């Protein structure tokens, strides 16, 4: 029996730097129509990114200072915030710099967010 490779089997990947989170194309797909994102940490110390539509942002019930822009490019997307990366580095005890730290990602359909799996 032949097991054919398909693009759907590719893994999403996030790369962390001192100034941004970069998502590969696979991890970026759920964010193609996002206006902004919220980023946080879950109880397992994984990074959680939730896409927010323009309608959700304009409802006014979210603190605009906690919403971040996501830049979508043809082969990747990027969330830039030195403050965010300092927070993540401190909380997760990660040495973030110009050298990349790469982690696998998982899209959680039921929660409508992307999880960056931080394994130590």
Language-model segments: which ranges?
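Mature exported/compartmentalized surface modules and terminal targeting/interaction regions
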Residues: 1-2, 7-10, 41-44, 48-120
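N-terminal leader/targeting helix
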Residues: 1-28
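Beta-strand elements of modular eukaryotic interaction domains
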Residues: 12, 28, 37-38, 104
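Short, surface-exposed loop/turn motifs at beta-strand boundaries within globular domains
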Residues: 14-16, 32-34, 42, 109
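Short beta-strand-centered segments at strand-helix junctions
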Residues: 18-32, 77-87
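Long compositionally biased, domain-poor regions of proteins
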Residues: 20-26, 32-33, 37-40, 48-52
């Amino acid at each position: 029996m032949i097991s054919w490779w398909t693009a759907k089997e590719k893994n999403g990947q996030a790369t962390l730097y001192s100034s941004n989170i970069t998502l590969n194309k696979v991890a970026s797909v759920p964010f193609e129509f996002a206006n902004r994102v919220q980023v946080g940490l879950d109880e397992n110390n994984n990074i959680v990114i939730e896409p927010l539509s323009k309608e959700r942002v304009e409802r006014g019930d979210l603190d605009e200072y906690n919403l971040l822009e996501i830049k979508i490019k043809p082969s990747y997307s990027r969330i830039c915030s030195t403050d965010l990366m300092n927070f993540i580095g401190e909380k997760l005890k990660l040495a973030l710099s110009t050298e990349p730290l790469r982690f696998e990602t998982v899209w959680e359909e039921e929660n409508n967010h992307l999880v960056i799996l931080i394994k130590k």
